[in-house]
């Protein structure tokens, strides 16, 4: 059944002339409790059906023995009892039991063959150990009883099959680790150099970008005292399209082995426009070279600039491009492809490019209100912008770029325990789902563009955080929302816990990170960032980042058990923890429903209050020593394990800050008239309640981040926290 059939969209208007836009329609306020009820119903039916299947198995064995004994009376009685009971077992569950042995045999075969998006993949099912043993990549249970088989199939199942408890894909990628390292500092050129350093020699380029607080709050670099000191600190400074071109120069953003993650929320739609336009102009540049148009294009650029200085890439601490940087993306600095190529050519390149680019933008405004605080627009308007981006993605067939990364990491870093992190994150995800459905989008058009982001600490619940998230999402999307298999698959990124890193005995931090990475890899996370040991005291160095990358590489390539891809399955404690955490999440869903759902709870700051309480609980236990932390409150060294003071704190230089301001000034001097027109069109689109992302894609070519933010403040309102 379609989502629209389940939840008909009602057009609701307020009295007066303006239309009232509801984020969650009033008739859908119980959506979280409906999810809880649906999952509990599924779990109860699973137990009941498994019990019937087990009794049928017992009768089957009894029939075999009666037949051997040639007791016709007993056999007839057992046949009648069996037939009566069999009627209570659903047809789907009969098929599960009947197909069990074939499934087991498929994993015993030398190769496992399956399809992903119509592409057939052939994967070897075993690896050889140094002792020449054949180690299965997927280890199957040796169940005989039909009830055990059914219970396991309906609640666990193999990776790649509903409810995806063990993973959303049948096997991991053979030639690529799930490594995605986080970087961002100073100018775009400095961060570009770091990106090329961490990805040099790797088969896949998976870049994760941290932005400075000026960018995070949608502002432009400026000499203003409250802005100048923050330019390029704790993240990269990005204020316009040219910055984005420099940031990812040398990486072909359309290559299937390249993907980009951007940790940006309030101004996320603007950064996505910069990214998309940078990718489009890269492909325009390739077209220019392939067709020998360099001289013609250069002539057009010279006419446009008419003697003025063009933006340029200024290599960081060098006179040359970083190793591995081919210069791709730098030819059209200061201009866009549509200024130098015919419209039909540009439009074709644009359509092909945005359909190919791979990546993720965080864009989760709900967790910003609840935990991280980089909200810039009013919540309703920010959600409208998110919906506009997703609607644009649907209409332009953008399937490989995730429009939102629904994030629990910041909730955990603010102090939430793993259960609250997961409950708030999933509830936020279902809130986005409900809002998009209320706008008329079909779940199968947008749910595959969702991704999730969790923290991994050392608490026991973290060992099952992915299992529970995948299971809850799949059950709800399939049984309540009617989503297809791709919509049911929850894909997530893990970053090891920054909060668990301590400024005392910092060398011990690598041990903590290793254990957290082991949790994540055993739980089949889709990508992983391992924190550097010195992040507790400074921005990581190249040496510490290399060590952090080595942690997950050693697990993936040297640790023998990691060759198996479902090592958690079959563990009594893992299975019990999964059930316990699942029910704890559903209870939290019910508490949120009592407070009016996620948005209603936010109005009374329920989530923030709970996070603060849990943070205080942890800090008190740490302070008293009841919660032991090695090298911090116990097992101190002879000097008392004092806080480590860094020899140098990495900061953006004054030259980098001035460079960013000059880039901005050059943009304004060249495009001042075009900026006025673009910003006016953007505001008009908002007042007419049209999709803003179409206008943002144009404004992003000539306007700065701060200009766009200020234009949207005028029509959408600035963020104000409820008190």
Predicted regions and their residues:
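N-terminal leader/propeptide and maturation segments of large enzyme subunits in energy/redox metabolism
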Residues: 48-94, 98, 288-306, 442-452, ...
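Flexible glycine/proline-rich, aromatic-decorated loop/lid segments
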Residues: 399, 440-446, 483-496, 504-536, ...
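Intrinsic disorder at enzyme termini
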Residues: 526, 558, 562, 584-678, ...
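Short beta-alpha connecting loops at secondary-structure transitions
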Residues: 370-375, 411-417, 454-461, 495-506, ...
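Extended helical scaffolds that flank P-loop GTPase cores
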Residues: 2-149
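Generic, well-ordered alpha-helical scaffold segments in large soluble proteins
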Residues: 197-198, 210, 241-251, 274-282, ...
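Flexible, glycine/charged-enriched surface loops at secondary-structure junctions
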Residues: 287-290, 349, 396-404, 436-449, ...
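Catalytic alpha/beta active-site cores
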Residues: 101, 105-456, 461-462, 480, ...
């Amino acid at each position: 059944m379609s989502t629209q059939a389940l939840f008909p969209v009602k057009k609701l208007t307020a009295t007066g002339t303006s239309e009232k836009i509801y984020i969650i329609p009033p008739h859908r306020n119980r959506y979280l409790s409906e999810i809880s009820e649906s999952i509990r119903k599924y779990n109860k039916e699973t137990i009941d059906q498994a019990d019937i299947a087990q009794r049928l198995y017992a009768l089957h064995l009894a029939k075999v023995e009666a037949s051997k004994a040639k007791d016709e009376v007993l056999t007839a009685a057992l046949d009648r009892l069996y037939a009566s009971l069999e009627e209570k077992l659903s047809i789907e569950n009969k098929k599960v039991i009947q197909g069990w042995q074939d499934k087991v045999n498929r994993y015993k075969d030398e190769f496992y063959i399956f399809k992903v998006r119509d592409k057939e993949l052939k994967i070897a099912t075993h690896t050889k150990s140094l002792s020449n043993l054949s180690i299965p990549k997927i280890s199957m249970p040796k169940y005989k009883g039909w009830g055990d088989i059914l219970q396991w199939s309906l609640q666990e199942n193999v990776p790649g099959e509903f409810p995806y408890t063990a993973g959303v894909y049948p096997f991991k990628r053979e030639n690529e680790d799930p490594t995605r390292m986080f970087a961002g500092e100073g100018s775009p050129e400095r961060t570009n150099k770091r990106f090329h350093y961490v990805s040099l020699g790797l088969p896949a380029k998976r870049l994760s970008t941290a932005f400075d607080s000026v960018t995070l709050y949608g502002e432009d670099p400026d000499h203003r005292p409250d802005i100048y000191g923050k330019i390029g600190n704790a993240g990269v400074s990005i204020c316009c399209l040219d910055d984005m071109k420099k940031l990812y120069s040398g990486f072909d953003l359309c290559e299937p082995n390249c993907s980009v993650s951007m940790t940006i929320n309030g101004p996320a739609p603007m950064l996505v426009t910069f990214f998309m336009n940078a990718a489009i102009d890269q492909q325009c540049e390739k077209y220019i070279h392939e067709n020998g148009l360099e001289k013609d294009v250069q002539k057009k650029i010279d006419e446009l600039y008419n003697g003025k200085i063009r933006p340029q890439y200024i290599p960081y601490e060098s006179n040359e491009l970083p190793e591995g940087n081919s210069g791709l993306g730098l030819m059209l600095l200061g201009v866009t492809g549509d200024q130098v190529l015919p419209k039909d050519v540009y439009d074709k390149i644009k359509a092909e490019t945005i359909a190919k680019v791979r990546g993720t933008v965080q864009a989760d405004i709900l967790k910003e209100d609840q935990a991280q605080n980089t909200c810039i627009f009013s919540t309703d308007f920010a959600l409208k912008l998110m919906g506009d981006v997703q609607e644009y993605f649907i209409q332009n067939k953008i399937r490989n770029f995730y429009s939102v990364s629904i994030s629990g990491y910041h909730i955990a870093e603010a102090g939430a325990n793993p259960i609250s992190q997961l409950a708030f994150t999933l509830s936020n995800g279902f809130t986005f789902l409900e809002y998009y459905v209320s706008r008329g989008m079909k779940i199968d058009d947008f749910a595959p563009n969702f991704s999730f982001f969790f923290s991994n600490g050392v608490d026991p619940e973290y060992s099952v955080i992915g299992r529970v998230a995948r299971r809850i999402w799949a059950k709800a999307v399939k049984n309540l929302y009617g989503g297809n298999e791709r919509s049911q698959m929850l894909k997530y990124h893990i970053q090891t816990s920054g909060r668990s890193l301590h400024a005392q005995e910092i060398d011990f931090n690598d041990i903590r990170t290793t254990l957290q990475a082991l949790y994540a890899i055993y739980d089949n996370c889709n990508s992983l960032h391992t924190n550097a040991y010195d992040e507790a005291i400074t921005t990581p160095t190249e040496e510490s980042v290399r060590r952090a990358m080595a942690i997950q590489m050693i697990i993936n390539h040297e640790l023998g058990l990691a060759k198996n891809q479902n090592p958690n399955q079959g563990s009594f404690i893992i299975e019990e923890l999964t059930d316990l955490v699942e029910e704890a999440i559903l209870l939290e869903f019910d508490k949120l429903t009592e407070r009016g759902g996620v948005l209603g709870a936010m109005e009374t700051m329920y989530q923030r209050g709970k996070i603060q309480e849990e943070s205080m609980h942890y800090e008190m236990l740490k302070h008293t020593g009841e919660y032991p932390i090695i090298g911090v409150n116990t097992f101190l060294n002879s000097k008392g394990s004092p806080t480590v003071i860094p020899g140098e704190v990495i900061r953006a230089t004054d030259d980098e800050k001035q460079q960013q301001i000059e880039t901005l000034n050059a943009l304004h001097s060249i495009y001042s008239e075009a900026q006025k027109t673009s910003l006016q069109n953007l505001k008009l689109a908002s007042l007419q309640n049209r999709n803003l992302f179409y206008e943002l894609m144009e404004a992003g070519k000539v306007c700065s981040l701060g200009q766009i933010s200020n234009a949207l403040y005028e029509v959408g309102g600035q963020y104000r926290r409820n008190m």
